[in-house]
Amino acid sequence: MPKPTKGPRLGGSSSHQKALLANLATALFEHGRIKTTEPKARALRPYAEKLITHAKKGTLHNRREVMKKIRDKDIVHVLFAEIGPFYSDRNGGYTRIIKVENRKGDNAPMAVIELVREKTVTSEANRARRADAAQKVAAAAAPQAAVEPEVTEGPSADEAEAVAETPIADEAQVEVEGTESVSEAEADEAKADSEDEAK
């Protein structure tokens, strides 16, 4: 059973709203971007995105479903020949709403709704970023695994007695030598990372 949409009818009846959305969608597909009031733009967005989803499928049935709403055959042809295939690898989010200054006469909130024309590479970029991060973590973990067993081993009893008998100056020298070896290990890791990135 058909039920009316919730909320206001954009200043008219349900038939007026259907005609209004069809005309706005026709203008959007023809020009790529239109300026309208913000409530109309928000109502147009799901309407237009459903039509683009039909165009992506490209079957005769989908073309007839779109023709029920958009009566201009030229616009339907553009929708199925150009716009639908352009978004073939994108799942939703075909339009963008940008708020602009209010209308001068009645101070109505205005917005520009446009088709998103940029190709998204976020999934490929995220995949590459994750692979680089995994390589860096693996490269950092491998030298640390080799260094950690040396660090975890405690000094032997003879070495402990020798360290206890040495003056404080010798202890400071040992600490400095330890930090130098750590900085050398970090330099080696940085060099290995730069070689991996060069590959």
Curated annotation (Swiss-Prot):
GO biological process, one term: translation
Biased segments, Low complexity type: 138-149
Any single GO CC term annotated in Swiss-Prot or TrEMBL for this entry: cytosolic large ribosomal subunit
Keywords: Ribonucleoprotein, Ribosomal protein
MF (Gene Ontology): structural constituent of ribosome
Region (Disordered): 138-199
Biased segments, Acidic residues type: 172-187
Record field: compositional bias (Basic and acidic residues): 188-199
Pfam family for this entry, one: Ribosomal_L17
Family: Belongs to the bacterial ribosomal protein bL17 family.
Description of how the protein assembles with itself and partners: Part of the 50S ribosomal subunit. Contacts protein L32.
Protein name stated in the entry: Large ribosomal subunit protein bL17
Organism: Mycolicibacterium gilvum (strain PYR-GCK)
Gene expressing this chain: rplQ
